[in-house]
Design a protein with these regions (language model features):
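Loop-to-transmembrane helix boundary motifs in multi-pass membrane proteins
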Residues: 170-181, 364-396, 441-463
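Membrane-interface loop-to-helix entry segments
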Residues: 140-146, 179-224, 233, 283-287, ...
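Juxtamembrane transmembrane-helix boundary signature
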Residues: 85-118, 128-133, 137-143, 305, ...
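C-terminal membrane-solvent junction of multi-pass transporters and transport-like membrane proteins
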Residues: 175, 414-499
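Hydrophobic alpha-helical segments and their helix-loop junctions in multi-pass secondary transporters
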Residues: 146-155, 208-236, 258, 299-307, ...
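Membrane-embedded translocation segments of transport machinery
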Residues: 57, 68-91, 95-100, 213-387
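Membrane-interface "cap" regions at the ends of multi-pass membrane proteins
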Residues: 2-78, 208, 214-217, 224-228, ...
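Membrane-water interface regions at transmembrane-helix termini and the short interhelical loops
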Residues: 73-75, 101-102, 117, 125, ...
């Protein structure tokens, strides 16, 4: 009995140790902590320039650089590729701004708003799905970052460059690569420690280094090739107008699809905006202008490297490795090191913003009593390392096809969010009912689940399954129509889910449409915001704190 009591005491101490310490105005419960509560004005510090810097992280990434190459490889010409890029970026900007208004006006993120759509318990499903996708993204972006670190170390240390591979071929990774990967993950730790609202200057610095490195690589390639080479003038391989039109539409889908997870994360970051309009121009400018430059840089550089090396190099780390392999002089080594530092900055910023903070916020929404954004980032980092991305790439030739198809599951989420906020709820939410699971809450629905969110999501991706299976295994034969529908997966998923969600909710209206809180329970709004919404701003911070603690006690007492 004494032993049982002792172990019970230890478990109790462990439980208390892993729980978050309450601070600020939020009383911790299984539904709320400081990172997922509606943000108060003191934490909403992002301006238009912040959003330009924040989204530039993705637009200046290696993924965006390589986007042009993937479209040219699909038989489009370079200039047709740029048309698809600009149109795709325009669509993505519109979706981002519409979804961003949810966070900018009500200051909540994806996990919390999902409770309004799916129910307070049903929201666990989209949150878990997005956690899985972002962890996989974490793993692959870390691996790419490790390749950039390998280029830096190879340029600095001749012994590292000539290091023998001590791992067997069955490991699917070299000694150099695994060292670079480990170092990249280590240097990610202090960057992940910073809160999103305090990362503005750091991200701006990383963006500058990223742009300088990528611009330098392009200028070097154009200079050594004495121009852009022949690939830039290569005509499209699509001869008929029908095939060309479909090819461009497929390119637009690819452009938008690469941002699918980031688009669902939009409200996670727009909630930091000082005012809703701050996110509009910042994202419009970044998506269309900056977002269209990098694919063009990638196309020009690849065309030039084909003239230099006899093959088109689409991946910047590969270009750095080629510099060192062809000429291990002090000049080449210095160039590889400085360019590598810029590329590491790019990957580090992208992994933190696109994967780290996203999985941190989702885990915080899943287990708010134990995980905040910072802890969630570290959990994501550990899970990403455990996946060993080189094994995933080597063990299944279809894995990359599966990863690239994630957008078909994310597009319906985007459509449902736009429909729910703009057409059904008409931009009005009852914040207090998003943070408890008592049956009297309007977002409790039926036992905490809302069937109205399930049907539109299924309609948004189930018809794409035949084409999805064919992309994984070409031996599976499908009709031309099914293949074409899958190629247009993102716009289909977005528009069909939006239409079905609107129709279902108009025919079967959910409870509480148009309701908002009478009082500013969480100290969320400025005086101007409260007046516009008709919310009472007279209560003090102490009243707000007592209300939050009362909410938490009621949840625990009902054991819901």
């Amino acid at each position: 009995m004494t032993t049982v009591i002792r172990y019970g005491t230890r478990l109790e101490h462990l439980h208390e140790a892993v729980k978050l310490s309450p601070h600020g105005q939020t009383a911790l419960s299984v539904w709320i902590n400081d990172d997922i509560r509606p943000l108060p004005p003191s934490r909403r510090t992002w301006s238009t320039m912040t959003f330009i810097g924040w989204w530039s992280v993705w637009q200046l990434s290696l993924t965006n650089w390589q986007l042009g190459g993937s479209l040219v490889a699909s038989s489009l010409s370079v200039w047709q590729t740029m048309v698809a890029v600009v149109l795709g970026r325009t669509i993505a900007a519109i979706v981002a701004i519409l979804i961003g208004y949810i966070g900018a006006e009500w200051h909540i993120g994806f996990p919390v708003y999902s409770r309004a759509i799916w129910g307070v318990f049903g929201a666990f499903f989209p949150t878990l799905l997005r956690i899985g996708l972002t962890v996989v993204g974490f793993a692959f972006q870390s691996y790419t970052g490790g390749l950039c670190v390998t280029a830096i170390l190879s340029g600095i240390f001749p012994t590292f460059f000539r290091m023998s591979n001590t791992l067997p071929a069955s490991a699917h990774v070299t000694t150099q690569q695994i060292i670079g990967w480990a170092i990249f993950n280590i240097i990610s730790i202090p960057v992940l420690y910073r809160r999103p609202e305090r990362s503005e200057k750091l991200m701006i610095g990383m963006n500058i280094m990223s742009f300088a490195a990528l611009l330098g690589i392009m200028i070097w390639s154009l200079s050594h090739a004495h121009g852009a080479g022949d690939l830039i003038h290569q005509p499209s391989q699509l001869q008929t107008s029908d095939s060309l039109g479909f090819g461009i539409m497929q390119g637009i889908t690819t452009v938008v699809g690469t941002l699918s997870i980031a688009l669902t994360s939009q409200m996670d970051f727009s909630r930091f905006a000082r005012k809703p309009s701050d996110q509009v121009f910042g994202q419009w400018f970044t998506f269309i202008i900056i977002g269209s430059i990098m694919p063009l840089f990638g196309c020009l550089t690849s065309s030039a490297t084909q003239a230099i090396y006899g093959e088109a190099l689409w991946n910047p780390p590969t270009i750095l490795a080629m510099w060192l392999q062809r000429d291990y002089s002090s000049t080449s080594r210095a160039a590889a090191v400085f360019a590598g530092i810029g590329l590491v900055s790019s990957q580090l910023a992208l992994n933190v913003v696109d994967n780290g903070y996203s999985v941190g916020m989702d885990l915080s929404g899943l287990l708010p009593k134990y995980i905040n954004i910072r802890r969630g980032c570290y959990v994501g980092l550990i899970l990403g390392m455990a996946l060993c991305p080189w094994e995933l790439l080597a063990s299944a030739t279809t894995f990359v096809s599966v990863i690239s198809s994630f957008s078909i599951f994310m597009a319906p989420f985007c459509g449902i969010h736009i429909s729910d906020y703009w057409f059904i709820r008409q931009r009005r939410l009852k914040l207090s009912d998003l943070y408890h699971a008592r049956p009297k809450g309007i977002y409790f629905y039926t036992m905490g689940f809302n069937w109205r969110g399930v049907l539109p999501w299924l309609v948004g991706w189930v018809p794409l399954l035949p084409g999805f299976m064919h992309s994984i295994n070409p031996a599976i034969k499908v009709s031309v129509g099914a293949d074409h529908l899958y190629a247009l997966g993102f716009p289909y998923g977005l528009l069909s889910s939006m239409a079905i969600h609107t129709l279902v909710n108009k025919c079967f209206p959910p409870p509480g449409i148009g309701e908002i809180d009478r009082d500013d329970t969480y100290g969320t709004f400025t005086v101007e915001e409260a007046a516009k919404l008709g919310v009472n701003k007279d209560s003090t911070e102490e009243d707000s704190d007592r209300s939050l603690r009362r909410e938490s006690r009621e949840v625990l007492e009902t054991k819901v």
